[in-house]
Regions:
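Hydrophobic positions within alpha-helical transmembrane segments of bacterial inner-membrane proteins
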Residues: 36, 291-292, 297, 331, ...
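Basic-flanked hydrophobic alpha-helices used for secretion and membrane insertion
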Residues: 47, 51-267
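Interfacial "coupling" helices/loops that link adjacent transmembrane helices in transporter permeases
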Residues: 293-334
Length: 352
């Protein structure tokens, strides 16, 4: 049997059949587009809900850095911050907490945070800026200013009495910036320069690393990895790369760590058991299969309307394989128009 090259003929038949049924094709394209809009909206809304949930979690956690290496010495901090696995890092050094009746119902922390750390803790000034090194400046939120009875004005002077590892001290500061108060955030912060924090340690006689609470004056390294899928695993790998561990506090190479539980992807990846994985896969397959059935039924109705045309083609010798190719080409062309149109419409509607 001779093999005849008839791909061009099949293409022309498919295109001419489409041109002969313009109204039907417009309806088919609209059906595909509307189905695509439906699923675009579904997935985008799901992602928006997840993002809102994460943001709420971050505020409860106190920030959105991936993980934390806690209570480090300066040497440990210098070692870990240059780890290639870490894409960004931020430094935080705790100084103390304000005392007095005004602060009895508020959790306020005074300390140094670099620009990255301040950003991750939602401490981005809406007026002014973060404090400069070598100055007596401080930045805080509007709630702390309200507790102090201070009007939010750049350059305003205020005095704060606070506890530094059991030693009370009173210090004066110049307001250099402030940000809005967020009730969802657990802790309020008063940020001061690193030089001022170290000066306060010296004034109260605190030697970093020898604080009674084990926390004041230490270096806390908050980090961001390339992604948030396996935060706990990545934190432990960083420790292992430098000969440390976070499981046995009795060992000399122990470093305390924290993992940001606000990331839903990390929670899912770290606790994903076979049953959960199957359930997630089943839901995704169901959604995809539902979309396939909707579009398939639209094309099935279109093909049924042309049954006489395909019968005539079969009578004159067109094989079933060739008929399938004609129908597949039509489906492909209509999908190439309908799916991008649906994606554009879906994304446009969501951003209105």
């Amino acid at each position: 049997m001779l093999k005849v090259s008839n791909k061009g003929v099949i293409r022309r038949l498919s295109l001419r059949s489409l041109r002969a049924s313009r109204t039907r094709n417009i309806i088919a394209v609209l059906a595909v587009a509307l189905t695509t809009v439906l699923f675009t909206a579904l997935f985008t809304i799901a992602m928006s809900i997840n993002e809102g949930f994460q943001q709420s979690n971050f505020r409860q956690c106190g920030g959105w850095s991936h993980g934390t290496f806690k209570y480090l010495t300066e040497e440990q901090f210098e070692q870990l911050k240059d780890e290639p696995m870490i894409s960004e890092w931020g430094l935080r050094r705790f100084v103390g907490m304000p005392t007095g009746e005004a602060f009895s119902k508020s959790h306020v922390e005074l300390g140094y945070s670099d620009a990255n750390q301040a950003h991750w803790m939602f401490c981005d000034p809406v007026e002014g800026r973060l404090p400069l090194e070598g100055s007596d400046e401080a930045a805080t939120d509007l709630h702390v200013l309200e507790l102090l009875g201070i009007e939010p004005r750049l350059g305003a002077r205020f005095t704060l009495t606070f506890d530094v590892d059991g030693r009370e001290t009173t210090q004066s500061f110049s307001l250099c910036g402030w940000w809005e108060y967020d009730e969802a955030v657990v802790a309020n912060h008063v940020l001061i320069p690193r030089s001022r924090a170290e000066a306060i340690y010296d004034q109260v006689g605190l030697v970093p690393g020898q604080a009674a609470d084990g926390m004041t004056g230490t270096w806390n390294l908050d980090v961001m990895f390339k992604n948030a899928l396996h935060i706990e695993r990545d934190v432990r790998q960083v420790l292992a790369n430098h000969g440390y561990q976070d499981e046995n506090p009795a060992e000399s190479n122990y470093i305390a760590t924290g993992v940001n539980w606000g990331y839903t992807g990390a929670q899912l990846a770290d606790s994903l058991d076979p049953g959960t994985a199957l359930a997630v896969a089943a839901v995704l397959l169901l959604i995809i299969f539902t979309g396939y059935l909707i579009i398939y039924n639209v094309f099935q109705i279109s093909v049924t309307n042309d049954i006489r045309f395909y019968g005539m083609l079969k009578t004159i010798g067109t094989t079933p394989a060739q008929l399938r190719r004609i129908i597949s080409l039509q489906a492909l062309l209509l999908s190439l128009i309908g799916i991008p149109l649906g994606l554009l419409c879906g994304l446009s509607l969501i951003h209105i």
